Amino acid sequence: MKNRVISLLMASLLLVLSVIVAPFYKAEAATVVNTPFVAVFSNFDSSQWEKADWANGSVFNCVWKPSQVTFSNGKMILTLDREYGGSYPYKSGEYRTKSFFGYGYYEVRMKAAKNVGIVSSFFTYTGPSDNNPWDEIDIEFLGKDTTKVQFNWYKNGVGGNEYLHNLGFDASQDFHTYGFEWRPDYIDFYVDGKKVYRGTRNIPVTPGKIMMNLWPGIGVDEWLGRYDGRTPLQAEYEYVKYYPNGVPQDNPTPTPTIAPSTPTNPNLPLKGDVNGDGHVNSSDYSLFKRYLLRVIDRFPVGDQSVADVNRDGRIDSTDLTMLKRYLIRAIPSL
């Protein structure tokens, strides 16, 4: 956990942010989202998101560079690597929304990076650079032990709410869902659809931006362990969701495959059922990716048109994106 030393370092970070980051953050007028928001990371959506291009300083021993935020096979990837000829020895990625989000349920599906001395994160943040107090809610993976996740939050720059939760699995080995429901008098944290912790003191109140980053620490060895300089390292993200009215149907999106769908008319071909088993599920999604990567040149199903999910007469990445949105319940049907 962070100790008094960490708190002091983070306080100094707040001052640095107010000076260095202000021009970057103020590029967009503040907009608070009060409707459901779903982002599937098939590509860079510059209308909703920004790639950071600056440095925090303090405990963050890297510069954020847009080149370190990439998209591949339906994932957003943050890459920590060496930086040559700059003010920092390392470069990495940070991705964040242009808009602000308040009370509600937040969820991410991600795979953390594993290595001593680093942090993979999903969080909300606002601060002096937004003309706001420093309010923040964190889900953080300390790379030295990715069988645990750390929850924390700040209200007006005051933290000290760290809680380490034993996951029962290694977060760097596979994708899982993590979330939190933020309310005026509590924050509930979730792992794979199960509520695992509730915080009730010093709850933040100011809407913030949804953010993700990967970074190596410096001067915080007691917390993170001493970073050994290993590169490249990657944290991967599949989607982000926000529901202002709280946990949808009192149950966050679980990691296991969504129950297969069955056509109402069995005589009609089922859109998205590219393996021809009568259902649309993650097996079809995996097969579709293999097709687009040209690992296979034809789907097992007889009617190849079932792959034209968006019905535009072509079979391409837009169909895969639509299929993925259906599987994570971002859209009700195909």
From Swiss-Prot:
PROSITE patterns hit by this protein: CLOS_CELLULOSOME_RPT, DOCKERIN, EF_HAND_1, GH16_1, GH16_2
Cystines in this chain: none
Residue ranges annotated for the GH16 domain, each copy included: 28-248
Dockerin domain mapped to chain residues: 267-334
Catalytic activity: Hydrolysis of (1->4)-beta-D-glucosidic linkages in beta-D-glucans containing (1->3)- and (1->4)-bonds
Superkingdom, natural source: Bacteria
Signal peptide per UniProt: 1-27
Keyword Hydrolase: yes
GO molecular function list: licheninase activity
Active-site residues annotated for this sequence: E136, E140
Pfam family, one: Dockerin_1
Family, similarity comment: Belongs to the glycosyl hydrolase 16 family.
UniProt-recorded name of the protein: Beta-glucanase
Organism: Acetivibrio thermocellus (strain ATCC 27405 / DSM 1237 / JCM 9322 / NBRC 103400 / NCIMB 10682 / NRRL B-4536 / VPI 7372) (Clostridium thermocellum)
